[in-house]
Amino acid sequence: EMEVWRGQQEGLKVIIVNPGVILGPGFPSQGSGTLFSTIKKGLSYHTLGTTAFIAIPDVITTMYRLMKSDCCNERFTLIAENLVFKDVFFTIADALKVKRPTRYASPLLTTIAWKIDALLAFLSIKKRTFSRVTAKASHSAIPYSNQKIVSQLEPTFTNIKAYIQEIAPTF
């Protein structure tokens, strides 16, 4: 991002887009697709933290509209909704027709989990999948705002729970 702003200082017109967690079909072993594949395999635990989500068609449409607009040299946060992880996990589980993750993972439990994950990765037993940052974020409840993009373009964002139902069959 710093390089983009440097380019702006050189005279380029730039728009920075910071999306929330982007949900889209396919790619079960990458990005947000790992949420679907992990829950499908049988995730037992959930947390009560929140984060921002957006559907990939909304990202594409909004970026296209920004490129066609007169707007330049600004940064936008693209989110449709701030949702609790527990609710998202339950929605994904229901859409995949698998058991919901019913046990609450406390901050202590997620701390232990990331340390075990780090140890197993250090010993080359498995690839790193759960970091300290992920553990901390899973309990964070700081909402993100999309007011700037809403006031500029007045976009209509897809309902995330409905979109999860739509894309779940691709996993």
Stretches with model-predicted labels:
Residues 30-31, 47-67, 74:
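Substrate-positioning beta->alpha
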Residues 12, 25-29, 124:
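Proline-centered turn/helix-capping motifs that create local helix->coil transitions or kinks
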Residues 18-19, 23:
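Conserved SDR Rossmann-fold cofactor-binding beta-strand/turn motif
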Residues 16, 53, 82, 143-144:
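Short aromatic/basic micro-patch
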Residues 1-16:
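Active-site Tyr-X1-5-Lys
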